[in-house]
From Swiss-Prot:
Its EC number is 6.3.4.4. It is found in: Cytoplasm. It catalyses: IMP + L-aspartate + GTP = N(6)-(1,2-dicarboxyethyl)-AMP + GDP + phosphate + 2 H(+). Substrate binds at residues 298-304. Pathway: Purine metabolism; AMP biosynthesis via de novo pathway; AMP from IMP: step 1/2. The gene is purA. GO terms for molecular function: adenylosuccinate synthase activity; GTP binding; magnesium ion binding. Binds 1 Mg(2+) ion per subunit. It comes from Shouchella clausii (strain KSM-K16) (Alkalihalobacillus clausii). One of its GO terms (biological process) is 'de novo' AMP biosynthetic process. This is Adenylosuccinate synthetase. Pfam families: Adenylsucc_synt. It comes from the Bacteria. GO terms for cellular component: cytoplasm.
């Protein structure tokens, strides 16, 4: 039995999809455990670039089971479209399994997300407007609709009708906009349910059977630790738990069966949407990193905010997620910068903070304390081992590991799979 969790250590977009795809070669089962189609990951397979939002990146390997776990919220329309996209590109999806306990995103969730963000104006959270938060709200309020319900038309119709009594009043009275027809939703979305029914299973059984049989299971996190609803920069967070602890809840696998947690990080920091960002760069260096690193959201297309590497953030991620291994990505993007900076701690009213504060008011007044390191000019995009890196690049990587307290397992020097390099194995 061997299991590995891949989590983002920052605010998402760290390159988890590529690392998951890379580690998928050794895995026999790949599972997602939280989030929905608000997550976007780009995978290069057989020379082709694919963008996925719901389906695990292991789908390209016919011999690997891919699981959408119970902790996810699924937009059936988006899922059917993503399946069609894969089929159009000749990808066999018969290895997909969808949890019958996962909750469903319906049109009223998406509309609620949009009108509420618009209502907040300047105080908006910066959601992807995909209905993720409202779906998780219904789940917590115990009025959510699950995949198992979607497949039973009478049950589905009764639940939608009951929920819309409240939702339509909310739309019409509070938001002063049109509500929805229960009949139209049921007809459209039951049809989507019919198209995905063959993939639906009790995925907790699938995953535990695989682990008990000694198979290698890879759990693929979405977003990042700093977007975790409990451990992130609340309220500028997602509505689920991307941390490794979310695996046990979102997949139905007990904590004793988790062995390695790979924390994925860029060699700098990015963030999409609103919220605090202590090391943000609003200058030419930030613009350069954004351009060279192609820092635009897979899901939203929005320019990502860019900043220096923040070891306070990644140490926080290590602690709350039990990270055992570091995957450091996009080192090549820093090539050509004369001086590099790493945030080692924060200064708050004369006090040095080594740990990430919970209060956003405190965080807003924190100034990053930087350590400066010399940059490098050499092209590193073809490097295969740490020893091949220029001395300054190697020193930078080593310092990141020292400041975060996480040993290096993987590093990448470019966007392609061939530019991802393993330092030590994670699967037994």
């Amino acid at each position: 039995m061997s299991s590995v969790v891949v989590v983002g250590t920052q605010w998402g977009d760290e390159g988890k999809g590529k690392i998951t795809d890379y580690l998928s070669e050794k895995a026999e089962v790949v599972a997602r455990y939280q989030g929905g189609n608000n997550a976007g990951h780009t995978i290069v397979f057989d020379g082709k670039k694919y963008k996925l939002h719901l389906i695990p990146s292991g789908i390209f390997y016919k011999d690997k089971i891919c699981v959408i776990g119970n902790g996810m919220v699924i937009d059936p329309k988006a899922l059917v479209e993503e399946l069609a996209y894969l089929h159009d590109h000749g990808v066999d999806t018969s290895n997909l399994r969808i949890s019958n306990r996962a909750h469903v995103i319906l049109p009223y969730h998406i509309k609620l997300d949009i009108v509420e963000e618009d209502r907040k104006g300047a105080n908006k959270i910066g959601t992807t407007r995909k209905g993720i938060g409202p779906a998780y709200m219904d789940k917590a309020a115990r009025i959510g609709i699950r995949i198992a319900d979607l497949l039973e038309k009478d049950t589905f119709a009764a639940k939608v009708a009951a929920v819309l009594e409240e939702k339509n009043r909310l739309f019409e009275k509070y938001y002063e906009t049109d509500g929805f027809s229960a009949e139209e939703i049921v007809e459209e979305y039951f049809h989507y349910g019919e198209q995905i029914a063959k993939y639906v299973a009790d995925t907790s059984v699938v995953l535990n059977d695989a682990l008990d049989d000694g198979r290698r299971v890879l759990f693929e996190g979405a977003q990042g630790v700093m977007l975790d609803i409990d451990q992130g920069t609340y309220p500028f967070v997602t509505s689920s738990n991307p941390i490794a602890g979310g695996v046990t809840i979102g997949s139905g696998v007990g904590p004793s069966k988790i062995h390695h947690v790979v924390g994925v990080s860029k060699a700098y920091t990015t963030r999409v949407g609103d919220g605090p960002f202590p090391t943000e760069l609003d200058d030419e260096i930030g613009d350069r990193i954004r351009k060279v690193g192609n820092e635009y959201g897979t899901t939203t297309g929005r320019p990502r905010r860019v900043g220096w590497f923040d070891s306070v953030v990644v140490r926080h991620a290590r602690r709350v997620s039990g990270i055992t291994d570091l995957s450091l990505n996009s080192i090549d993007v820093l090539t050509g910068l004369k001086t590099l900076k790493i945030c080692t701690s924060y200064r708050y009213k004369g006090e040095v903070l080594d740990e990430f504060p919970a209060s956003l008011n405190v965080l807003a007044e924190c100034e990053p304390i930087y350590e400066e390191l010399p940059g490098w000019e050499e092209d590193i995009t073809g490097v295969k081992t740490l020893h091949e890196l220029p001395e300054n690049a190697r020193t930078y990587v080593e310092r990141v590991c020292q400041l975060t307290g996480i040993p290096l397992t993987v590093f990448s020097v470019g966007p392609d799979r061939s530019q991802t390099n393993m330092v030590r194995g994670v699967f037994a």
